[in-house]
Regions:
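Active-site helix of classical SDR
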Residues: 123, 157, 165
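Conserved glycine-rich Rossmann-like NAD(P)H-binding loop of the short-chain dehydrogenase/reductase
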Residues: 27-44
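Substrate-binding pocket helix/loop in short-chain dehydrogenase/reductase
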Residues: 99-100, 104-112, 192, 199, ...
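Residue(s) in the substrate-gating loop at a strand-loop-helix junction
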Residues: 141
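C-terminal substrate-recognition "lid" of short-chain dehydrogenase/reductases
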Residues: 129, 211-238
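Alpha-helical segment proximal to the catalytic Tyr-Lys
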Residues: 128, 169-174
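Conserved glycine-rich cofactor-binding loop
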Residues: 11-12
Length: 243
């Protein structure tokens, strides 16, 4: 039977790295559902960057994962086509550099919905078709363990994701579904493209390895966590020794 994997936000950044790692290790009849938001051009670029063989495995589905209704449409589409899901990667996430006093309620709500509420209900809706012994992975963040004033709401949601990871272990025990999370630190993604050299230097001084992590390094670890048969309820840091 083919392996069916779902990844949200899989056309850019860490999500893309994880998606490509899965494709790299996939069998010819495996299927990978990849959700993307409003950037159709980016999604198409991701698709066409893959080998012809891997393109056939990809199912690109547009869905605004800050919206419960959009998420439900995504789930309905998956259930129409797939009889089971083996791996689920809740990766999509958004943030803001706004200060606490500048947040609006709508901004706060959108980030909470995207990073926490919708992933909670995505697991709930897909649970009935998750395979026995399946694997769920959340992309958390070291910001969920270390407070940063510039990303308060993001950190709050990621801290909640870490707790959710541990809480779901017992919920999904009857089907022996493993639930884990990764908690990346500062990783070289487009999110940091506007940082000044001074900002990079200041952060690198706090990292024992004196550099930002690479997407491929996070993807490698995510893949190992997904397939490890005895990891369950773990939140795995990957931050280069940030302190």
């Amino acid at each position: 039977m083919s392996k069916v994997t779902i990844i949200t936000g899989g056309t850019s950044g860490i999500g893309r790295g994880i998606a490509e790692k899965i494709l790299e290790n996939s069998a010819s009849d495996d299927i990978l559902y990849v959700s993307y938001g409003h950037n159709t051009e980016q999604a198409e670029e991701f698709l066409h960057a893959q080998t012809e063989e891997n393109q056939k495995k990809i199912r690109l589905l547009q869905a605004d994962m800050s919206s419960y209704d959009e998420m439900m449409k995504f789930v309905s589409r998956v259930k129409e086509e797939a009889s089971h899901v083996d791996w689920l990667i809740n990766n999509v996430g958004i943030s803001t550099y706004a200060k606490y006093e500048d947040y609006t309620f709508n901004e706060w709500t959108k980030i909470v919905n995207t990073n926490l509420s919708v992933p909670v209900f995505l697991v709930k809706e897909l649970r009935p078709i998750m395979s026995e012994g399946g694997s769920i992975l959340f992309t958390g963040s070291y910001a969920g363990q270390q407070a940063y004033s510039s990303s308060l709401v993001y950190g709050v949601t990621k801290s909640a994701i870490h707790f959710l990871t541990k809480s779901l272990v017992k919920e999904l025990e009857p089907k022996q579904i493993r639930v884990n999370a990764i908690a990346p630190g500062f990783i070289e993604t487009s999110w940091h493209k506007n940082r000044t050299p001074e900002s990079y230097e200041r952060i690198n001084r706090k990292i024992a390895l004196h550099r930002f992590g690479e997407i491929s390094e996070v993807a490698d670890m995510a893949y190992e966590v997904l397939k490890n048969g005895y990891m369950n309820g773990s939140v795995v840091d990957i931050h280069g020794g940030y302190d």
